[in-house]
Amino acid sequence: MLIYLFEWLSHYFKGLEVFSNYISVRIIMISITSLLITLALGRPMISWLQKMQIGQIVRDDGPQSHFSKRNTPTMGGVLILSSVIISCLLWGDLTSIYLWILILVVIFFGAIGFFDDYLKLVLKHPKGLRAKYKFALQSIFSIVLAIVLFYLLSKNGQMSLSIPFSKSLYIPMGIVIFVVLAFFIINGSSNAVNLTDGLDGLAIVPVVLVAAGLGIYAYIETNSTLANYLLFNYLGNPGLAEVAVFCAAVCGSGLAFLWFNSHPAEVFMGDVGSLTLGAVLGVIAVMVRQELIFFIMGLLFVVEALSVMLQVGSYKLRNGKRIFRMAPIHHHFELKGWPETKVVIRFWIISLILFLIGLAAIKVR
């Protein structure tokens, strides 16, 4: 919205055209805007959640240190999502269909997560939205979205799977493989981030790092000069560059949310935040054709999800025997005696290393 205002004002005031003509400037401005919105609305929202008694439910069989988290305000993810949408409407190019798709993903998965949280925290339904209904909604949306993305991206022939650390190795994909891969990436990422969000600040930092990494790839691949210089396939789809702007909004809002979510957490994002942010990252990875880079940068999420799958499989197939003391795996380390802050910071370090490996693939090819 603001880019049109600055474009008009630039006819009367020299220099204002940088806010409408340069995506790099808008990336900076949207990250600052989303950060300030989240910081400004954070305290009032926490107070409102406390007043409405929308608080965290803690498992009785979990680490004893978690008992103090009981009734901590939850559903703070609404704050992140609202900030991202408002910032995108202000600084995004509203003619970009890719920007609107990402906003739609935020709204749809946010609605699923919100309803799940509402059932658990407000109506006191012990399990919230049933897993089969949640999975069905996610699946239908992901499949439809994957088909839409296939036809949008295929207009410029960008239907190959990019192989990291390779200059010219790409795997072509037809619609079936593309849709299946996109389905698993979007749904898997959504649920993996949701499983990771179990300790103060644990999930939001990896989310910010992965969003930043994918944003960098989006900026490079939609800039013909940078793409040619770094030997990337140039993604010339009109409006696709707005993916980088969207990523910046996620980073700004996520960092501001960490202000309130760091130990001891004043608010948790809830399913409304974690399910949505995970889905958004998956969609972005598909849009910029960097699914394998996303796997590298988001490997922490993969490990968290695999730990749950292995735990459940072991319990069912080995007569109740478990691999971990508790799953997801961050709880396993807590029950081994690691303080929560040590688990979180070490997982952050791992996520940072994975982020740097993913960035290294830009040049080491």
Swiss-Prot record:
GO biological process: cell division; cell wall organization; peptidoglycan biosynthetic process; regulation of cell shape
Superkingdom, natural source: Bacteria
Function: Catalyzes the initial step of the lipid cycle reactions in the biosynthesis of the cell wall peptidoglycan: transfers peptidoglycan precursor phospho-MurNAc-pentapeptide from UDP-MurNAc-pentapeptide onto the lipid carrier undecaprenyl phosphate, yielding undecaprenyl-pyrophosphoryl-MurNAc-pentapeptide, known as lipid I.
The keyword Cell division appears for this protein: yes
InterPro entries per UniProt: Glycosyl_transferase_4, PNAcMuramoyl-5peptid_Trfase, PNAcMuramoyl-5peptid_Trfase_CS
Sequence similarity: Belongs to the glycosyltransferase 4 family. MraY subfamily.
Matches recorded under PROSITE patterns: MRAY_1, MRAY_2
UniProt entry keywords in alphabetical sequence: Cell cycle, Cell division, Cell inner membrane, Cell membrane, Cell shape, Cell wall biogenesis/degradation, Magnesium, Membrane, Metal-binding, Peptidoglycan synthesis, Transferase, Transmembrane, Transmembrane helix
Record flagged with keyword Cell membrane: yes
Pathways involved: Cell wall biogenesis; peptidoglycan biosynthesis
Entry's localization field: Cell inner membrane
Topology with respect to the bilayer: Multi-pass membrane protein
Membrane-crossing segments per the record: 22-42, 74-94, 95-115, 133-153, 168-188, 201-221, 240-260, 267-287, 292-312, 342-362
Cofactor(s) essential for the protein: Mg(2+)
Chief location of this protein within or outside the cell: membrane
EC number: 2.7.8.13
NCBIfam families found in the cross-reference section: mraY (TIGR00445)
GO terms assigned for molecular function: metal ion binding; phospho-N-acetylmuramoyl-pentapeptide-transferase activity; UDP-N-acetylmuramoyl-L-alanyl-D-glutamyl-meso-2,6-diaminopimelyl-D-alanyl-D-alanine:undecaprenyl-phosphate transferase activity
GO cellular component: plasma membrane
Protein's name in the database: Phospho-N-acetylmuramoyl-pentapeptide-transferase
Gene: mraY
Catalytic activity line of the entry: UDP-N-acetyl-alpha-D-muramoyl-L-alanyl-gamma-D-glutamyl-meso-2,6-diaminopimeloyl-D-alanyl-D-alanine + di-trans,octa-cis-undecaprenyl phosphate = di-trans,octa-cis-undecaprenyl diphospho-N-acetyl-alpha-D-muramoyl-L-alanyl-D-glutamyl-meso-2,6-diaminopimeloyl-D-alanyl-D-alanine + UMP
